[in-house]
């Protein structure tokens, strides 16, 4: 039998972060009960030398935590088993590091951006996967790292209003200026005619460009230090639930990017609202934290594109991220039930029991107020309001994968206000498999 290898562990190599099941992090920051996952011949006692900083520790809801200070060769693919996921070596294999966003880490991240590399960073919505938005080759690395189709446009992120004008081909309208004053910095993206400075692959060949001014201080500082607009979709593998914690990013992008800035959990929890400003009336292409009613109150009117709650038609091009493909999806099959709560609960119980009898591993996603309707069946909480659902939805979908669920049954909410953003994300995760009860 092959003997597990032992390593010398110089301090110089102790800057990498790795995922550990939450049960293996002691309250004092050490590591315990790791023998099932670590094949180092010292067992758990050897692992206990590496400590998690509780001030910087990012907990993955119900699943794992990021352990800072562990040397990567100790936690190699040979000696450490990552539960619930696999990592494929290949062209993307990089030494992915996770750092707290202090000034030194931000300067290093900005240098990587300027050098055409990729950095994951927190925003108030979700974590973004950033590259120099004026460098077509750097932008192409985003598509490659994510496995993202080339016809799915990106958003440029700026850190000042002055940075907008060079990116767009015309002066913003008075309506756009009012919306900037009301919602920037914040979770609103606006689409304008694209200037010649913006590479075509940022906009997937469209003659428009999507621009956002985020409010998260880490995002703002990174953009300012980089000195360029940062092109950034969500920092996950294409089709997966968007990341709202650094642990989610590491789960999807480990080995594919060089650096993750860990700014803690995101506040909003769903991506920004995307509004097309090229017509007479602001048109919502992707709902988010800024609602249609809020936009109408500032702009005088707003309209919601029909594709928000349906797949694109054959030959229809996506004008915004999140319009064309199945997004945000867990590994299991997801079905959404809409209707009166007790009737919905009855249908979900019936579907759950049928899946269980078929040998599947079902899971129910429900509002807190309805949990009692499901008895002792497995239920993941969606929160107690549409706002709470928006904040926790992507983490819940990732938890479903951690639990090994292969048949998911979710309650719906009414598609208005923030509920429209929730139903848009749930709908795309379920390929719009919505059952009316």
PLM feature spans:
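Short, positively charged and aromatic/hydrophobic N-terminal segments
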Residues: 59, 66-68, 73, 81-90
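Serine residues within intrinsically disordered or low-complexity segments
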Residues: 32, 45-46, 58, 65, ...
């Amino acid at each position: 039998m092959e003997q597990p290898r032992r390593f010398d562990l110089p301090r110089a190599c102790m800057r990498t972060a790795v995922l550990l099941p939450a049960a293996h992090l002691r309250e004092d920051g050490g590591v315990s009960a790791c023998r099932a996952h670590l094949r180092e011949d010292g067992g758990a006692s050897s692992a206990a030398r590496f400590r998690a900083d509780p001030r910087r520790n990012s907990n993955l809801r119900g699943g794992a935590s990021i352990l800072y200070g562990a040397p990567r060769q100790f936690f190699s693919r040979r000696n450490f088993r990552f539960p619930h996921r696999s990592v494929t070596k290949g062209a993307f294999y990089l030494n992915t590091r996770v750092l707290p966003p202090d000034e030194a880490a931000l300067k290093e991240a900005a240098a990587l951006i300027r050098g055409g590399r990729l950095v994951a960073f927190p925003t108030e919505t979700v974590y973004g996967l950033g590259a120099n938005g004026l460098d077509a080759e750097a932008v192409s690395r985003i598509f490659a790292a994510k496995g993202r189709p080339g016809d799915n446009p990106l958003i440029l992120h700026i850190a000042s209003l002055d940075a907008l004008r060079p990116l767009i081909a015309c002066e913003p309208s008075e309506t756009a200026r009012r919306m900037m004053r009301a919602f920037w910095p914040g979770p609103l993206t606006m689409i304008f005619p694209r200037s010649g400075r913006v590479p075509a692959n940022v906009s997937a060949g469209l003659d428009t460009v999507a621009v956002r001014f985020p409010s998260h201080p880490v995002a703002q500082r990174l953009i300012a230090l980089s000195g360029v607009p940062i092109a950034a979709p969500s920092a996950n593998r294409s089709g997966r639930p968007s990341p709202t914690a650094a642990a989610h990013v590491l789960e999807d992008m480990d080995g594919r990017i060089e650096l993750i800035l860990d700014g803690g959990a995101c506040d909003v929890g769903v991506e920004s609202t995307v509004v097309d400003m090229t017509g007479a009336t602001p048109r919502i292409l992707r709902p988010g934290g800024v609602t249609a009613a809020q936009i109408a109150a500032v702009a005088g009117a707003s309209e919601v594109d029909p594709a928000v709650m349906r797949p694109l038609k054959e030959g229809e091009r996506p004008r915004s991220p999140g319009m064309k493909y199945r997004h945000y999806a867990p590994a299991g099959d997801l079905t959404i039930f809409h209707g009166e709560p007790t009737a919905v609960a009855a249908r979900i119980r019936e579907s759950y029991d049928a899946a269980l009898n078929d040998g599947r591993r079902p899971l129910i996603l429900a509002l807190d107020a309805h949990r009692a309707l499901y008895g002792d069946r497995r239920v993941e909480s969606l929160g107690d309001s549409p706002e709470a659902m928006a904040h926790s939805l992507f983490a819940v979908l990732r938890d479903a994968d951690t639990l090994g669920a292969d048949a998911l049954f979710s309650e719906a909410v009414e598609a208005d206000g923030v509920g429209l953003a929730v139903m848009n994300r749930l709908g795309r995760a379920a390929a719009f498999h919505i059952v009316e009860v």
